[in-house]
């Protein structure tokens, strides 16, 4: 298995592709199926042979200035300097993933191993995966979308020398909660539009129902609730939680005391302003 984060493995893309292309051509086969010939365009002339100039003429008729998917499948004869895309000339996902420390990579394996197969883009109403995707039809709210956002978030943290694993361990071992003042200031800055990619990740994670259908049905077992909880742990060490979270979190401690004064509690709950606040918080 090739690890595209390893430059020595990435360098094997060209020789392996050349060998496979030669082997399939030798036996009258193709290097691609219904899709996938675009990034393998350098092999198109070898497979089409004498028909390749006809493809170039067709390309020139509809795209004389080589503006539509340049470098893919065929170059127009009207642009003689145009070249086909080289199989080792495109950016690989591993080029970006190298910014993620290996320890962090292993720790967030339920997110980073998403291979983009798209099984979560499921329209079948009887299939459990994924309810938030089915409800929104927004790919950001799919397991694939959330895994991609987390991987990019980890990459950006790595670029700034932030070790998210160490940060999580520190929070748990020291219970070192950020001061309410700092949390409030950060949250105000967020409301005022201060840029932080974490907010985009948060919006995607907030729509997850934590049903774990992805963990059971995704072919590579992407587990959104698992890495979602870890992200939220760090996110809310920097930004305030919604008020409703604090209210619900306090119920376990306040209900035993409220149970001693049921009439007063019921009266307060029936007051118009209180009901309005509870309905809208």
Where are these regions (language model features)?
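Iron-sulfur-cluster electron-transfer modules
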Residues: 169-171, 180-281
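Proline-centered turn/helix-capping motifs that create local helix->coil transitions or kinks
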Residues: 24, 28, 66-67, 122-125, ...
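Short, well-ordered loop/turn and helix-capping segments at boundaries between secondary-structure elements
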Residues: 4, 22, 26, 46-50, ...
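Iron-sulfur cluster-binding cysteine motifs and their immediate structural context
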Residues: 70-72, 113-149, 207, 211-232
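Mobile "lid/hinge" segments at catalytic clefts and subdomain interfaces of large enzymes
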Residues: 21, 55, 65, 120-171, ...
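Conserved glycine-rich FAD pyrophosphate-binding loop
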Residues: 1-115, 139, 145, 167-170, ...
């Amino acid at each position: 298995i090739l690890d595209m984060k390893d430059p020595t493995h990435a360098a094997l893309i060209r020789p392996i592709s050349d060998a496979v292309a030669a082997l399939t051509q030798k036996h009258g086969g193709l290097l691609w199926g219904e899709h996938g010939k675009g990034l393998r365009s350098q092999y198109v002339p070898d497979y089409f042979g004498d028909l390749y100039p006809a493809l170039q003429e067709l390309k020139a008729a509809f795209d004389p200035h080589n503006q539509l998917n340049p470098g893919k499948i065929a170059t127009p004869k009207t642009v003689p300097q145009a070249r086909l895309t080289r199989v080792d000339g495109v950016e690989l996902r591993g080029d970006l993933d190298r910014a993620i420390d290996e320890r962090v990579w292993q720790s967030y394996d339920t997110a980073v191993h998403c291979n983009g197969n798209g099984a979560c883009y499921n329209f079948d109403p009887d299939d459990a995966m994924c309810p938030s995707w089915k409800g929104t039809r927004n790919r950001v709210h799919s397991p694939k979308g959330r895994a991609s956002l987390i991987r990019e978030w980890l990459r950006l943290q790595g670029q700034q020398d932030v070790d998210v694993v160490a940060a999580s361990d520190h929070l748990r071992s020291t219970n070192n909660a950020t001061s309410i003042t700092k949390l409030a200031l950060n949250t105000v800055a967020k409301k005022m539009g201060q840029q932080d990619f974490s907010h985009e990740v948060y919006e995607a994670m907030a729509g997850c129902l934590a049903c774990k259908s992805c963990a059971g049905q995704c072919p590579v077992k992407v587990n959104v609730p698992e890495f979602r909880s870890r992200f939220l742990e760090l996110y809310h060490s920097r930004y305030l939680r919604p008020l409703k979270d604090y209210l619900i979190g306090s119920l376990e401690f306040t209900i035993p005391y409220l149970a001693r004064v049921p009439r007063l509690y019921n009266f307060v709950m029936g007051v118009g302003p209180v009901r309005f606040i509870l309905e809208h918080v």
